[in-house]
């Protein structure tokens, strides 16, 4: 492969369920690498397992990618749909002498391996049909096997792992086409990547051994070998391979926990890749900075505290439109009702104050409770203690004092302080009944932030409801 070829990457998930967090990171790395080089990011659905590959599972993958904000070029490619092309290549390898027909049965192969095991030999199958005379082949079902080199080495020149060498004696003559005519995964992947023009294969390092075998197919067909980059897997906080015992493993779970997509892109990009000491960045920076040299060899560890920090940074810097879109996506992910126009109208002016303190969308919405409720405000038991007779009287005075105020923060705060001083009370004592009246809770954002967000009419109405 020459450096002049436009960059083409691909994400090739098997649609057997939701999009795993590891798969999401692999997709992100491919997307960033392509987008940062004006290349193409392609999507292939490896749906050859017809029992597990369902339309619903495929849609779950697509939904996960859409939520994460990863757009792909062209239509998704179905691997199953290319099975005739895969078979065509297997037969082309028969013609050029790099593959052969193998008539060995499953029972014969198993017997070979059992005997080899008993004798302490390698159990790699050595087909007796590898060098058989074509004129003497039986008229029977056969598989097509790669005539892999027996001597020497196959080197995977990996952009992350470095050169990884495999002795050819340890790589068997893999099956390319089964006796029922169906292609194997190894063949299908190589043919699809070649036909799609893929220049860089960025995937998990659990595929590293596969790369050596796939290189042999590329060489047999005389095709350009793509750049391989095998990235380390994601581990849990205990250093073990990520699993459900560590918490959320599906991307949809993170969406339901209220982490914005922008924060997930930032966090996942840093999970195994680095650009100096930069921890927080936007998409434009990630696309410009991302390269394969920055990917480490060691497994990355999931860190929820770091994720919350990243999430808080992204929430704080979002504009109102973007943040409201994220909130809508979050509520959809959790099955909650969409916010009404009235709720959005009250929430929008509150976002500036709320977003600087929230680490997640649920935390923001919890603080935004006052903007999402309607009159009459339900008063929680703890907040009700701040609405005794004296406090209601003070609230009534404050209501009258701010009735005709210019409704700016300084004016509202000055009025509250003046009422407090007239009763020998601090601002906190005046704010407590006001807080209860506006939100029905004892823990809320600043009372003046709430008053500004709710506006004059709604604020006065809530105050009057409790002032008596």
From Swiss-Prot:
One of its GO terms (biological process) is glutamyl-tRNA aminoacylation. A motif ('HIGH' region) lies at residues 13-23. It is found in: Cytoplasm. ATP binds at residue 244. A motif ('KMSKS' region) lies at residues 241-245. It catalyses: tRNA(Glu) + L-glutamate + ATP = L-glutamyl-tRNA(Glu) + AMP + diphosphate. One of its GO terms (cellular component) is cytosol. InterPro entries: aa-tRNA-synth_I_cd-bd, aa-tRNA-synth_I_codon-bd_sub2, aa-tRNA-synth_I_CS, aa_tRNA-synth_I_cd-bd_sf, Glu-tRNA-ligase_bac/mito, Glu/Gln-tRNA-synth, Glu/Gln-tRNA-synth_Ib_cat-dom, GluQ/Sye. Keywords: Aminoacyl-tRNA synthetase, ATP-binding, Cytoplasm, Ligase, Nucleotide-binding, Protein biosynthesis. SUPFAM superfamilies: An anticodon-binding domain of class I aminoacyl-tRNA synthetases, Nucleotidylyl transferase. Signal peptide: none annotated. Its EC number is 6.1.1.17. One of its GO terms (molecular function) is zinc ion binding. Monomer. Catalyzes the attachment of glutamate to tRNA(Glu) in a two-step reaction: glutamate is first activated by ATP to form Glu-AMP and then transferred to the acceptor end of tRNA(Glu). Belongs to the class-I aminoacyl-tRNA synthetase family. Glutamate--tRNA ligase type 1 subfamily. PANTHER family: GLUTAMATE--TRNA LIGASE (PTHR43311), GLUTAMATE--TRNA LIGASE, MITOCHONDRIAL-RELATED (PTHR43311:SF2). HAMAP family: Glu_tRNA_synth_type1. This is Glutamate--tRNA ligase 2. It comes from Paracoccus denitrificans (strain Pd 1222). The gene is gltX2.
